[in-house]
Amino acid sequence: MLYRSALRASCGFTPRLASTRSRLASSLVLLEHKAGRLNDASLSAVTAAKATGNDTHGILVGSMAEVEGVLKEAKKIKDLSKIYLATSDAYSHSLAEALAPLLASIVPTKDVSHVFAAHTAVGKNVFPRLAGMLDSSLVADIIALDPSRGTFTRPIYAGNAVLTVKSSPKDSVKIVTVRSTAFDKAAIADGSADVEDVEILAIESPTQFISEELTVSSRPDLASAARVVSGGRALKSKESFDKILDPLADSLGAAVGASRAAVDAGYADNSLQVGQTGKVVAPELYVAVGISGAIQHLAGMKESKMIVAINKDPDAPIFQVADVGLVADLFESVPQLVQEIGSIKA
């Protein structure tokens, strides 16, 4: 409690949560965006919010230049009835020190019972601070919820167990981050959400945005790709990693991923890591090449719709979750597979 009080004081914010309100009527979703496009993970958060049975509202935050193009897309989200719009240069780049106080000032005045965000870098940065400011618990990385019981389900122990939790009755607002692979994306179709501007909160943030360096790739984004080809330590070197995986990924139109062992060995960049400490993916097709299947890796890909494993060890744990397994030398089988795919395409 002392920490939360200090956090609120440092931001000049005092919550105004009504103690006599009998029913909190809406769920609010933080709509992330980048380069003029909505983040697909936020669409999954909208689906989770809709499951509460409340009216579902979204909030777009950023500079006018950032949100101008996104707003048109956001208004079409099928399950949103209203979008709150907060435009200011102070909200550029989604810094937690600016966003959390803004959200905390909006929640008490808009009859909000739940606040949702995707369990992304932004959600993981903003929502713990928001929970502290609202004196509520944070329920992180949920994969299911039961509104009738007021419970949430989240994975623990690298996905080997699931935990059902219920936030405290003292929490007037539920603060929730959502594992995007566990919920379908809300459709961007025939929605017609109303737009309401919200008051800009003047806060002197101790944090300033300096710069951002992004890895540019012609391939699909790993986190949202429909197909993923991942390589493990069995590829033996960075040269082999690229030589074997790139043609297969290109032939399938897939993103490239890697196990932690491959990343630690220097075969692939950290941004390509799939697993508990990397990205969690659930593509239509996941091809694991030379990956043994450590628990930490399985936690990041076992929800994939179709898992294909190629490994010369028949006892590799990856085969326990694979839909299709090939026990073979990857240095021989993968080039043959690429050749066969090319023949089919021709």
UniProtKB/Swiss-Prot annotation:
Residues spanning the signal sequence: none
One Pfam entry name: ETF_alpha
GO cellular component: mitochondrial matrix
InterPro entries from the UniProt entry: DHS-like_NAD/FAD-binding_dom, ETF_a/b_N, ETF_a/FixB, ETF_alpha_N, ETF_asu_C, ETF_asu_C_CS, Rossmann-like_a/b/a_fold
Principal location class: mitochondrion
Compartment annotation: Mitochondrion matrix
Cofactor(s) needed: FAD
Entry-linked CDD domains: ETF_alpha
Family: Belongs to the ETF alpha-subunit/FixB family.
Name of the protein in question: Probable electron transfer flavoprotein subunit alpha, mitochondrial
Residues engaged in binding FAD: 285-313
Cofactor binding note from Swiss-Prot or TrEMBL: Binds 1 FAD per dimer.
A molecular function (GO) term: flavin adenine dinucleotide binding
SUPFAM superfamilies membership: Adenine nucleotide alpha hydrolases-like (SSF52402), DHS-like NAD/FAD-binding domain (SSF52467)
Complex and partners: Heterodimer of an alpha and a beta subunit.
Role of this protein: The electron transfer flavoprotein serves as a specific electron acceptor for several dehydrogenases, including five acyl-CoA dehydrogenases, glutaryl-CoA and sarcosine dehydrogenase. It transfers the electrons to the main mitochondrial respiratory chain via ETF-ubiquinone oxidoreductase (ETF dehydrogenase).
Top-level division of the source organism's lineage: Eukaryota
